[in-house]
């Protein structure tokens, strides 16, 4: 997102106003399965349109727009291939696939963001109280779509977490709110000596078991069901808390951090990552907009600054607290429990 200092005139303002054009083009390309069709080999315009079901009228403009956006490459006049990034992350058969988030944007984010003005006037979330943002687990296919989108959001963080600590000092970790276990499985693969636990609501367990089977990690990551605030947390050397704190108000954040401190073994560590806002609150536009997303989708949630996170961890008794940038817009805070 362009910082305000780069908005110099009406052209920049209009470009910002029309920024959703590119987002919508990407979402349509994912819906048409375009990047999976192009995985492995380029296709000429006519064959690509036939296989993707694209009408000739808008085809060339659509595909060339994706070229201009860096998602496709064109050879000659009418042969298209995936860009390297699209081939890695938008082919649904690849492990780095993030297209699930594009589908979530289409079905959930676009409609709820249309109610931003109402949220700003009332201070109230704009999703149903029952079922929340994605509607709960009653519809398994909808739930899988949402969980796939969350895997996409968290996918890039796994590599950073694998190198964030000297993991030889630890024997176990809990991914708090770890959903279907995607990040926990990634971290266990990087450090097989670790005992891995995914802690989430009991309703998540069938999706967890299904995903672990697909990753062939059924015996490597265990599931523990419960509520963050009322059920006992598993004992572990490390707790991972990713994209969790931003969903709650200050009192609940502080209570959860205190519970984590209590559950950690002496000498253990907590890893907190979120789309934290820069301390000056001037340049992290995506994180600030993400905070508005929490306004739209939660009762009290918002994004927060690294300085706030350091203060909460320190107040709970963690020492040697530090922060560092990780994948994408995320910032990681690390704190240690004294021995």
Curated annotation (Swiss-Prot):
Disulfide bonds: none annotated. Pathway: Antibiotic biosynthesis; tetracenomycin C biosynthesis. GO terms for molecular function: O-methyltransferase activity; protein dimerization activity. GO terms for biological process: antibiotic biosynthetic process; methylation. It comes from the Bacteria. Keywords: Antibiotic biosynthesis, Methyltransferase, S-adenosyl-L-methionine, Transferase. Belongs to the class I-like SAM-binding methyltransferase superfamily. Cation-independent O-methyltransferase family. This is Tetracenomycin polyketide synthesis 8-O-methyl transferase TcmO. S-adenosyl-L-methionine binds at residues 200, 226-228. The gene is tcmO. It is an enzyme of class 2 (transferase). It holds the Pfam family Dimerisation. Gene3D superfamilies: Vaccinia Virus protein VP39, Winged helix-like DNA-binding domain superfamily/Winged helix DNA-binding domain. The active site is at residue 246. The keyword Translocase does not apply. Its EC number is 2.1.1.-.
């Amino acid at each position: 997102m362009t910082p305000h200092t780069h908005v110099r005139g009406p052209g920049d303002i209009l470009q910002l106003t029309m920024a959703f054009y590119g987002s919508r083009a990407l979402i349509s390309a994912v819906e048409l399965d375009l990047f999976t069709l192009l995985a492995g080999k380029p296709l000429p315009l006519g064959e690509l349109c036939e296989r993707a079901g694209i009408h000739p009228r808008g085809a060339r403009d659509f595909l060339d727009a994706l070229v201009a956006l860096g998602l496709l490459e064109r050879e000659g006049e009418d042969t298209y291939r995936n860009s390297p990034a699209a081939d890695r992350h938008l082919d649904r058969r690849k492990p780095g696939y993030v297209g699930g988030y594009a589908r979530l944007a289409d079905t959930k984010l676009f409609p709820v963001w249309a109610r931003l003005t109402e949220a700003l006037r009332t201070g109230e979330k704009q999703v149903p109280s029952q079922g929340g943002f994605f509607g709960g687990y009653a519809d398994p296919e909808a739930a899988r779509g949402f969980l796939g989108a969350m895997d996409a959001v968290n996918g890039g963080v796994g590599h950073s977490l694998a190198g964030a600590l000297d993991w030889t000092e630890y024997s176990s970790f809990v991914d708090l709110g770890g959903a279907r276990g995607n990040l926990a499985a990634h971290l266990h693969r990087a450090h097989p000596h670790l005992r891995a636990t995914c802690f989430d609501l009991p309703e998540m367990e069938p999706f967890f078991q299904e995903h672990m089977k697909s990753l062939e990690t059924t015996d490597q990551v265990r599931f523990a069901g419960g509520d963050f605030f009322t059920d006992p947390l598993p004992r572990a050397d490390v707790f991972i808390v990713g994209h969790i704190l931003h969903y709650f108000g200050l009192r609940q954040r502080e209570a959860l951090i205190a519970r984590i401190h209590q559950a950690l073994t002496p000498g253990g560590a907590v890893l907190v990552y979120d789309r934290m806002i820069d301390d000056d609150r001037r340049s992290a536009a995506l994180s600030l907009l993400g905070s508005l997303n929490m306004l739209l989708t939660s009762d009290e949630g918002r994004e927060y600054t690294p300085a706030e996170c350091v203060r909460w961890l320190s107040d709970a008794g963690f020492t040697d607290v530090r922060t560092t940038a990780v994948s994408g817009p995320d910032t990681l805070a690390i704190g240690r429990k004294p021995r």
